[in-house]
């Protein structure tokens, strides 16, 4: 079965519930005052890394997921219930990007690491919340805010210290099965391994995670064969084992095989060929194995590259583990282990800017072919949605918000006069003064 390590989804947080207008009705107290409760907050969309999750298969066919809306307010000062959060569990190693600008939102590298992807809308106020010594019987209430909507991509990149790369049938699965308790499918034909296989290799009181990456073919960097599906998984590895088969059945020339794999890695990402790498010649026990090894060794010596010879099948690994752990320790002491963490400013999720505090929102006024003034303003859009125009008190409040935004002054500055028509959100208004 093919692994699902990439998907695109649309997530929508819950909308806030609406506040209501209600009045207390108590015996012997006919003027009980306002009693409309606030709406509940909408549920958030939360992503959480889980070590028991190893695929994005459960999201593959779910293109749009929703958190629960908050409930509307109720009479007798009863507030609406908050909407339930939508919790999505993802594999450790998942990177989440905003599809709109391709920016990284979060990189999950720890078990139980959580991230609020979309914030739920705040519940609207009921009329009880507007009561004051000046306004004892307010006919004011609010709609709840809309929940955030985000289109994202989720991509799993496995967290392994050592990646094993090479052509199909080079012996990668056999090698990881001999080094660890991993049980990959092994057979004498190409593309036996169809998904990355991870194995923990313990050696001299130390341990590293090895990843057997499905075999690459020519033009893998352009998507041929399994292509990009698995090249991404070695991006996180500190070091690579480049495994080359010495069996004439697997390739015509081990030197050419080396160059082809290096070329594919370079095309996919120049950073891959800059990683610390061990070149290992496998199947030294086959006919002409020694002869082909000497040819490869001589070829690589010209590039100042050493090569180890092993037989993974017979578990004749020589000093392979010595070299791997030595190179790994040297690498992390020089550069530090991969933390895969984001800069601090990216760890802090942006705040939903659908609020009246967004004072720097630009106000755009243009004249259309019908001689109407077309107004575009996010803050005005927010308050039109927030304040229902169903009571005189609400209409007055909306008028005050329009003045605060400065729309009247802006219209006058561009030449608008009494009797002109203002068009906003499908509605027409007439300037009276």
Swiss-Prot record:
Its EC number is 3.6.5.-. HAMAP family: GTPase_Obg (MF_01454). One of its GO terms (cellular component) is cytoplasm. It is found in: Cytoplasm. Its cofactor is Mg(2+). It is an enzyme of class 3 (hydrolase). SUPFAM superfamilies: Obg GTP-binding protein C-terminal domain (SSF102741), Obg GTP-binding protein N-terminal domain (SSF82051), P-loop containing nucleoside triphosphate hydrolases (SSF52540). Mg(2+) binds at residues 173, 193. Residues 160-329 form the OBG-type G domain. Residues 355-433 form the OCT domain. The gene is obg. Monomer. This is GTPase Obg. GTP binds at residues 166-173, 191-195, 212-215, 282-285, 310-312. Keywords: Cytoplasm, GTP-binding, Hydrolase, Magnesium, Metal-binding, Nucleotide-binding. GO terms for biological process: ribosome biogenesis. Residues 1-159 form the Obg domain. The keyword Translocase does not apply. Belongs to the TRAFAC class OBG-HflX-like GTPase superfamily. OBG GTPase family. GO terms for molecular function: GTP binding; GTPase activity; magnesium ion binding. An essential GTPase which binds GTP, GDP and possibly (p)ppGpp with moderate affinity, with high nucleotide exchange rates and a fairly low GTP hydrolysis rate. Plays a role in control of the cell cycle, stress response, ribosome biogenesis and in those bacteria that undergo differentiation, in morphogenesis control. It comes from Mycoplasma genitalium (strain ATCC 33530 / DSM 19775 / NCTC 10195 / G37). It comes from the Bacteria.
